């Protein structure tokens, strides 16, 4: 029987009735006949809703609960003119399909990706192994990987005195399908929570509906607004891989608990079994010499107290490169092919709140060397997954823990190991300024007493278009408008000083005040390299306010400026108004 014959039979059989009506989304499709033939062969139904065409869900004769998490795979790089009649025969070769969802565009073509859910988890794993890079058309390969089935929401703005039971009760009142609420104690005060929680739902659809209902402006909890977004989903690690893990993840530690204390506590069952401990704020990773020792310590110490805090101990989760790269892309609101990640191997805990991303969440005032690992930007647009098909978290902070405060990369803590801290040089001894910028900036105060009150303010310097020009001309623009004109009575002395510039004077007194250019500023720290050019100070002429002090006399002199006497090469010690001198342009801060 051909596809046309089956269509005619289905529509003409009077005993079938209204059930033979062509489903919406199939009627008028370019391959309508092929889709109807597929439905007749397999007995699956097909319906289009929310921008996706769903095949099955459940399959004919299905009895029992919905398949567990991990049974779904993501299929990408699908040619836009390939539909279920070509996809189903390929994917049913590795197991029984529970449901196939093909994302559709308004023009009737697919959007390049689909989700295939199998009845059992091992069938999904087999699909990833055998069908990834499957050639669906000549030269067109499919991309198949495990689907990130996100059933977890992040909820911020929770009163810090609320307990887990109170939060669970309140969330269950306004949303459906709540399975669990994960709440973490504050690092500083274990009696308080951290102002946020993670809510797990029975399905992704239930989580999506809850997120829509809890969006800001629609509902309030405890009398004020809350922040709601997708949390990063739990990473699913292969069971065979987990059987080799011998690293424990320990959380809910006290801030003051030391690595040595943790090592003694976890090594008490078998002395010498702990290789090393890495503690980060209030969580830690404990490395064991064998898996047996790790499991034994976990079973005996989970739920016990250490220095007054109840410990939570689990096995750390290793992440492969491809999977970790996909999760990083998902955290930025995108998808696509996986790329290699240099920081491997690494371990992450599935829901670790003990990262710097939590301490300012949902605010963007995140500071520190790992800030780029916390703040995620971007949104799901164009062909991104949306509504019930969304399998990516939103553009929020990361919460997956691990060996770093960012996303579980242990090596990030050691990238700068042994590297000396960069430090700027001081113009004024013992001057302390809080570091607020990677470039060291310290002020120097100078004065020109002969200016008078008529020059009480500086003219604004025009902003140059090139940074180097700005460095060269900044001080010139500031000093030139207030430069003191030379006294005619001293013109002869100035001319004599200029004539004597070709030789090194034998006297220790400086030349006339008005005939002396400012030379490069020197640091007060001995043996510090100095910039050999006049730099930002240009060729402006200013007077010295006082003779050299004992401190200046002991400093290193600039041989090129020796013609100007013992004071040459040092910045004048007083101006009537304070100037903020950008020291990083004068001294090398590396």
From Swiss-Prot:
The lineage of its organism: Eukaryota, Metazoa, Chordata, Craniata, Vertebrata. PROSITE patterns: RRM. Signal peptide: none annotated. The RRM domains are required for mRNA stabilization. Homodimer. Interacts with A1CF. Interacts with APOBEC1; form an mRNA editing complex. Interacts with RBPMS. It is found in: Nucleus; Cytoplasm. One of its GO terms (biological process) is hematopoietic progenitor cell differentiation. Gene3D superfamilies: 3.30.70.330. Its main location: nucleus. Residues 1-21 have a biased composition (Polar residues). Single-stranded RNA-binding protein that functions in a variety of RNA processes, including alternative splicing, RNA stabilization, and RNA editing. Functions as an enzyme-substrate adapter for the cytidine deaminase APOBEC1. With APOBEC1 forms an mRNA editing complex involved into cytidine to uridine editing of a variety of mRNA molecules. Through the binding of their 3'UTR, also stabilizes a variety of mRNAs and regulates the expression of genes such as the interferon alpha/beta receptor and interleukin-10. Also involved in the alternative splicing of several genes including TJP1. Keywords: Cytoplasm, Methylation, mRNA processing, mRNA splicing, Nucleus, Repeat, RNA-binding. It comes from the Eukaryota. It comes from Rattus norvegicus. Disulfide bonds: none annotated. One of its GO terms (molecular function) is RNA binding. This is RNA-binding protein 47. Residues 1-26 are annotated as: Disordered. It holds the Pfam family RRM_1.
